[in-house]
Amino acid sequence: MVNPRLVHLKKRGDFLRVASARRKFVTPSLILQARPHDKSEAGETAPIRVGFTVSRRVGNAVVRNRVRRRLRAAAEAILPEFAAKNSDFVIIGRPAARDKKYASLTGHLKSALVQYEKQNKNQKLIAE
């Protein structure tokens, strides 16, 4: 079931905009790239937008799709609670993700989100 608060990134340009923000948080099983967006990009509701990618280094197509499904399930469980509402995220599966348990994947995603929130808070304080 698709979470109504999450919108999936599908276009290459969206992925490139998130990567160009240079906010990257690395964990053993995934890399989280993040970028805040403004309401002019996403509309008034400002949903959480997320994209998933898994490279061929992770395994063949069957393995990559399994990793992508597990990352998608973890994101749908974690992002609505812990993520900033006006953000775009790209979750990149790493080779270690194929052997990790679901609880480990969600823990890694939470830790990456905590790092992102800390960095966002620090940048807001510096801007003031």
Explain the meaning of each model-derived region:
Residues 1-128:
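Positively charged, solvent-exposed patches that mediate nucleic-acid binding
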